Amino acid sequence: MTNEPAGLGGLRVLVTRPAHQADTLCRLIERAGGEALRLPLLSIEPMAPALVARQFELARAFDWWIFTSANAVRHARTIDGGAWPGGLAAVGPATAAALEAASGSDVLAPLQGASSEALLARVELQNLSGKRVLIVTGADGLDQLSMELQVRGATVVTVAVYHRVPLPHAADAVEATLKRAKAIIITSGQALEHLLDLTPESARAALLKKQLVVPSGRVVEMAQTLGFAAPALAPEQMSDAAILHCLESWWKPQAQKT
């Protein structure tokens, strides 16, 4: 048995994931010696099922269906119980696992990382001339993915199966939670903007000093533009294990300073 302290000992982490997706990550943080604080910023709500179901029917014979998140898989399967095409792809391993479970089929996924760019690096998606592709995503999904697929010759249809709804929180509760947190896990650019909107002016300067963990380079740049002092951290993927590793790598030298 080791006498070394837990990897996140002394670290309070604010988890802003939707409530139904936060439990496992919070348990991992606490198992590593940290304290997980919860402040869900967005809820994930389904789009009108009748319209979405019609879009799935029209795309039944498409060559590829590409899913951008596990939420997209979950809501798509709730709406559409039919057979999905043989060409299924996912932008990362967590989405791929959800898609394999929902479809019972093999799924094309990035060889490394979790992003549309990583998926687009796969040889199977290089020449799409004459191919039809359905992107299954959330509202305000990955326009860059659609544009690149079209550049490669594909006819692309995008279907949004869910949308994110900002959740209200009392200003004093937000301020009290932020005072305790040293790091904040952010799930999207929309979530980051909403956190800033929720933060009272009296707590804004303190918020901008927090360490952020974000899902992509785009949100890293957004955080910098919004005035966060420390560069945001972007794990290779937003899986629970990758986020935990990212936090531990950052926190170890910080903890040694105290």
Which sequence ranges carry the predicted segments?
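Signature of uroporphyrinogen-III synthase
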Residues: 1-258
